[in-house]
């Protein structure tokens, strides 16, 4: 049998892509896969606009996408393999913004939304607590908007340990 040169490169490359993008971060199942969910920001929210956007009471609810959007996305992501150990029960996850709306995350970008598990130690409830703290710190000027966003895109668990504990 004659095989075209390089056929094994295609197979190896395809296998590497599958291996390189697991459903969850290798660091911790409470962190999203950084390839699938790198985070995205709302361009309207900048350091100079925080007092007319995120620091205004009710801002987050004014930009939050409808539940019909986030629930449909959660089901697509879970069915598409973005789940923890094959668990596709939607009730085990909260469709969450990696960069929270409270610090100017994009409301609807799939790069900023992921099915965050409730069933792990570092779960949606803990991240919610950090979101509230970082929002307060940005609005009172204790940290910059860029710093707050980095807390979530780098490793929100370390951010929790630094700012919430």
Where are these regions (language model features)?
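Nuclease and nuclease-like effector domains acting on nucleic acids or nucleotide cofactors
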Residues: 2-94, 102-165
């Amino acid at each position: 049998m004659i095989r075209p040169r390089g056929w094994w490169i295609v197979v190896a490359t395809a296998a590497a892509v599958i291996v390189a993008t697991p459903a969850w971060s290798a660091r911790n199942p409470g962190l999203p896969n950084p390839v699938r969910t790198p985070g995205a920001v709302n361009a309207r929210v900048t350091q100079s606009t925080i007092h007319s956007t995120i620091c205004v009471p009710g801002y987050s609810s004014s930009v939050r996408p409808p539940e019909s959007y986030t629930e449909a996305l959660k089901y697509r992501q879970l069915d598409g393999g973005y789940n923890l150990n094959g668990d596709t029960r939607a009730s085990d996850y909260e469709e969450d913004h990696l960069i929270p709306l409270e610090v100017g995350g994009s409301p609807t970008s799939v790069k900023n939304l992921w099915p965050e598990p409730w069933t792990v130690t570092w779960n949606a409830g803990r991240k919610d607590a950090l979101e509230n703290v970082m929002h307060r710190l940005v609005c009172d000027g204790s940290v910059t908007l860029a710093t707050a966003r980095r807390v979530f895109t780098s490793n929100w668990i370390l951010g929790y340990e630094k700012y919430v504990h």
